Amino acid sequence: MAADIREIAIDVVFDSEGSARVTERWDVDVDSGTEWYLAKYNLGAISLEDFSVSDESGMQYSYEGPNWDTDRSLSRKAGRCGLIVTRGGYELCWGLGSYGHHIYTASYTLKGAVQALDDCDYFHMQMVSPG
């Protein structure tokens, strides 16, 4: 996938139970490939739930669950999103739909994102994967 990233905006809201609701807005120009994905690895005991994607038109993508098929064509992935569960975490995937300028908004919940110690609570996570 070749893309120019114009802007990335990430908002994180924590709840009283230690979960984090994450909203990532990706403003991109895409000229090849069939899908976009966000790698979320090394999560330990943190689980990922409630994944959703919308685009600049406001269209909500259809969630297909944890069995995302990477081998489908551009048109067969359009308007769809899903997960790939790996040993180290998750890949959050969605179809590009078409080439050109797009603004994708991906949202998800990280259950158990805030960890408790004896003297404090903490959140430590790499939000944008390298590469």
Task: Give each language-model segment a name.
Residues M1-G131:
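Lumenal/extracellular ectodomains and adaptor appendage modules
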